[in-house]
């Protein structure tokens, strides 16, 4: 159904002729190696391209060690907004390379295990589940899922996992709105209404 429906239009995406900028390709390619784009943070610039911080530890993702060494709390906030995932989705759609889908699925699965939704776990991290972090994740996911939906690896089981996680995140946002009158609250409300 989700692969063949044509009556739903999202003005934020172009499935027919997706474009992939060199910057987006760089973000997507580095994510394959657990080097994640985090807005306003980069390890260095090499050959005119930003090189992002590596979260790889022995072939697995270490979400905490690097984040714990950064003096700026905004690094940790931005990390949990998953800003590299839209670029991976566009790269998949533009190239058909299943490595982007596989990387996204493994990374998102790993993240969900490391940071269980507060509805399911006591003592969940307020940085991960508060403020703009869940709102940006849900907003971006609604925009990038259509790019991945045609992957042969996007099984009904995985779709159910992602849709349930998205619904749970939306409910977590709704139950924990930021203070009245803030831009964060406005963003949260917009995401909940759209989701």
Predicted features, each with a name:
Residues 1-53:
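Extreme N-terminal leader/anchor segments
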